[in-house]
Swiss-Prot record:
Free-text comment on the cofactor: Binds 2 Mg(2+) ion per subunit.
Gene that produces this protein: ruvC
Protein's name according to its UniProt entry: Crossover junction endodeoxyribonuclease RuvC
Chain segments annotated as coiled-coil in the UniProt record: none
Compartments where located: Cytoplasm
Enzyme Commission number(s): 3.1.21.10
Species for this entry: Protochlamydia amoebophila (strain UWE25)
Chain segments annotated as transmembrane: none
């Protein structure tokens, strides 16, 4: 049985979807992969969602995570933006569910609190703490990738995460 847990964090967006993969080794968080899924800007929304879905499926197939963590949707005054973001979250969840991966959701403020110690941390503070927690030589960029890594770290710190539940 493996005692390593792999977590895929995702910060959804129709233009940029950040991803971050970490592995838990004992009490250490080890960065595995991070970056962004960027559908071409000239694509129609339906095509962008397909690119996001395929990108997430590739990440799941490549890294075999034990959990997928998605940022919850914030309340937006712009209904159109909220709907588009909700649909991006939906295709991410479908990709994970199709492969039988458990899905967890956390608010941005919860991830910031877990990583920085305050739910009102700036993007810069999140990048800096993610860099320190994962022993990266430079802060992870773009911000979307740092946010995705923060979500994965947040989940790794949750009491619901019991190593035995993820042993393979």
């Amino acid at each position: 049985m493996s005692n390593q847990v792999i977590i895929l964090g995702l910060d959804p967006g129709t233009k940029i979807t950040g991803f971050g993969v970490i592995r838990i080794e004992g009490h250490q968080y080890v960065p595995v992969d991070y970056g962004c899924i960027r559908p071409p800007s000239h694509y129609k929304l339906s095509e962008r969602y397909l690119v996001i879905c395929q990108g997430v499926e590739q990440l799941i197939d490549q890294h075999q995570p034990h959990a997928v963590v998605v940022e919850t949707q914030y309340v937006s005054k712009n209904v159109q933006s909220a709907m588009k973001l909700g649909m991006a979250r939906g295709v991410i969840m479908i990709a994970a569910k199709k492969r039988g991966i458990p899905i967890y959701e956390y608010a941005p403020s919860k991830a910031k609190l877990a990583v920085v110690g305050t739910g009102r941390a700036s993007k810069y503070q999140v990048q800096g703490m993610v860099q320190r927690l994962l022993n990266l030589s430079i802060p992870p960029t773009p911000e979307d990738a740092a946010d995705a890594l923060a979500l994965a770290i947040c989940h790794a710190q949750m009491p619901i995460l019991k190593q035995s539940q993820y042993e393979t």
